[in-house]
Amino acid sequence: MKNKSVLNTDSFDKRRFTEIFNMSKQLQGLNEAGEPRLPTFPDLLGDIWASLYKMKPEIKEEIPETLTANKRLMENIMADESFQNFREFTRLDDLSSALGTAKFGEKTNDWLAEQERKNEELRKQMEEARKLHQQLQQQQEKASGDGDDGAEGQRQDAEQNLQQAMKQAMEQIARELQQSGQSSFSQAMAEAVKETQKTKGDLKSLLGGITAGSGEAELKKVPLRGQIALAERISTLPELKEIAEWAGRFKQIARKKQRSKHEDSVDRSGITLGNQVERLLPMELGMYSHPATKADFLRRFAEGQTMQYEQKGKETLGKGPMVLCLDQSSSMRAMDTQAKGFAFALMSIARKQKRDFALILFSRRTRTFRYPKGKILPEEMVTLAETFLGGGTYFDRPLEEALKVVEESRFKKADVIFVTDGESYLNESFVERFNSTKQKKGFQVLSLLLGVEERETVELFSDEVLKAKDFDDESSHVAFGI
């Protein structure tokens, strides 16, 4: 992709934008949509990216006359207050600048279409520019395919005339744009900033773990192409956007549940020396707060010689997989995005505990997804977001799948979470076999009943049964304590 610029771009900038452009289906689609409206739109996209990515982007004083409209648009973009503030997040950031380019380009294209609709003179000039651009391309193609020297001079004259007419048309477009509504343009740019930040936030919610602030770190582990692809699906797939919002909420709850669980599992079994603030004895804190003993405390603290509680957590060996059996019968459709956000939160716990995670979707049939050590690829997230089985409810099939997952693991102490809003029949022989394997492999089953009262069947195979209105009910959050 070759582009001309009105900014102080260099060969690295142009090469890097070409790489980003080739990774982004959204930018490619936007390029195809924008070029028929404004012939220099592909060049404009490159400049929008450079203005977001470069440390010190500047608009050049002297530019080709055919880029006059681009210069006017870039002046409008870069003068906007929301744009300047946004650059704090996009400078030298490949992902943010790529997402920002798509959003700013989209809003600019929409704004141009609106101005063209309102301004008859602008519409005429842009139509003229489009015709001239098309004629210029045809003339250049004809020149490359015809080696007749006698006609070469005529073609060059015709090309020069077309280029001159194109310059005049683009200059007129720039003048008309200068008189167009700047308030609507500023509003469009502010929307682009907001939408870009929201998309990146949703991306971190999906990819992040349950550790506070882990979203950015987890994001960096994914190749840029994968980051861009998932971000673009979030911005175009409403279901994935909702799933990301629920995942972010549930991961925060899971973080608190896991922290509380860890604190409860730690015994203060004596006194030792060290410098961990949260474990210091009250006496040491008193010495820190008293002027006469503060210096001595700080010296001993720096040397790791302050007295603190000795804590011994329960020793944790390898644990079996975490298995989520998730009802996807037709009645669960309304809670689908909640359910998948819930699944992503459990998956992040498995990742933290370095446990395999299996998601068994069930209705009349089952579909099993396995994620070793709780790790999931961006494309797998999209597949999961788009999957919904529908149909009736059968319990034996997902439970049979859960047994397979548990029995294949070399570790005991698996956790099975069974979620349903329905009821099903289980024959006695299956229940006996399931419970026998459960005892042998040492795993537990927690069942969540959503909006139903019937618990007789799930009690046959569950260690604990909880009733909840939906996944956002506090009773459902008990699952995050596993």
Tell what function each PLM region has.
Residues 102, 109-319, 465, 473-481:
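Acidic/polar low-complexity segments with low predicted structural confidence
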Residues 43, 51-110:
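N-terminal targeting peptides and non-cytosolic leader segments immediately upstream
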